[in-house]
Regions:
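Long, charged N-terminal interaction/targeting segments
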Residues: 1-77
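Cys/His-clustered metal-coordination modules, chiefly Zn-binding fingers
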Residues: 76-96
Length: 96
């Protein structure tokens, strides 16, 4: 599992306020969370939002839940793509 400190170091625009309610996700999802964080960071560089914060990253019902404190269609799209990628990983793991 990725630490909040590590995420803050890599993506300060995304995690500058930490993760309000914590992060609880399986290690197998680290790559997807890092890719999502990278995409959000690049977006925030071009579209600054000083109020942006990640509220929580967790597993729920076998899927990724990545909660943020604001509504942004572009970022929400990135999150949906990451959730689908996790669903695919979980589907493949069940086939093994």
């Amino acid at each position: 599992m990725l630490s909040v400190e590590y995420l803050k170091e890599l993506y300060p625009l995304v995690y500058n306020k930490g993760i309000m309610c914590g992060s609880f996700a399986p290690d197998e999802w680290d790559g997807i969370i890092l890719e999502l964080s990278e995409r959000i960071s690049k977006y925030l560089e071009l579209n600054p939002n000083p109020q942006f914060a990640v509220d929580q990253i967790k597993e729920k019902y076998g899927g990724l839940r990545f909660y943020i404190n604001c509504i942004d269609d572009e970022i929400e799209g990135y999150i949906r793509e990451a959730e689908l990628a996790v669903d695919e990983i979980e589907r493949r793991l069940k086939l093994l």
